[in-house]
Regions:
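Acidic/His-rich structured neighborhood in mature extracellular/periplasmic domains
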Residues: 2-197, 201
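Pan-zinc metallopeptidase signature
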Residues: 197-221
Length: 221
């Protein structure tokens, strides 16, 4: 019986991975097309070629411990923690950090601007679309002065809180705007059909079925 259950688990994981790959391809194509429709192609300003190519992977993401000073709103340091922390674990970590005379908060990551980008597999459809655009813009900006200075801030080589705030704000605005356009164009009738599911949480298979309707169009290109 344990061997049979293990095989079933592997089968389900393989099926989910295959479905996730389709979701990633479809959403990446939709976001890229929408960016192009807004005249956003590449940071080099040469030709209508999208760069860097928009690619992301859906997976469970870790939490982050954000440490700030007590007297002002500013992130002093961010420490990546392991995945699947319980609420008790998070509160214990925060309490330990606070005893050092700082303000701390453990938050979940929605996405990471690695390449390909990593996006939380537990997020809803619209959040996934917005995050895909958000993280891509970070990659786009890395080839511009503001983005390069942000990379220096992230690596600790030249810390600049204002640059970090500007970069995140810009990526956030573009992510929401492009995400809204994509959602309106491709999924305008989606919300009514899944309102009940949204009340209880993210339903991967239900959202997968909706996205799957557009797969053939992209595979034919």
């Amino acid at each position: 019986a344990p061997f049979q259950l293990e095989n079933e688990l592997y089968g389900l994981q393989a099926k989910q991975a295959a479905q996730a790959a389709i979701v990633e391809k479809v959403i990446a194509g939709q976001v890229t097309a929408t960016l192009a429709g807004q005249g956003i192609f590449n940071p080099l300003g040469k030709g209508k070629v999208s760069f860097p190519p928009l690619m992301f992977k859906l997976q469970e993401l870790p939490s982050v411990l954000v440490i700030s000073p007590l007297d002002r709103i500013e992130s002093m340091r961010e420490i990546v923690l392991k995945q699947s922390l319980t609420l008790e674990n998070k509160e214990s970590i925060e309490a330990g950090a606070d005893r050092l005379g700082v303000s701390s908060l453990v938050v979940g990551l929605g996405g990471m601007a690695t390449y390909p980008s990593l996006i939380d597999s537990g997020a809803g459809l619209q959040a996934t679309i917005e995050t895909a655009a958000h993280e891509w813009l970070h990659q786009y900006l890395a080839f511009t002065p503001i983005g390069f200075r942000y990379l220096l801030d992230l690596t600790g080589l030249s810390q600049n809180y204002d640059i970090a705030t500007m970069n995140e704000s810009l990526a956030g605005m573009v992510g929401k705007e492009i995400g809204a356009l994509v959602y309106q164009k491709y999924y305008s009738g989606y919300e009514d059909g899944v309102s009940q599911v949204q009340q209880t949480g993210f339903d991967f298979n239900a959202e997968m079925r909706e996205i799957r309707k557009t797969v053939d169009v992209y595979l034919a290109k």
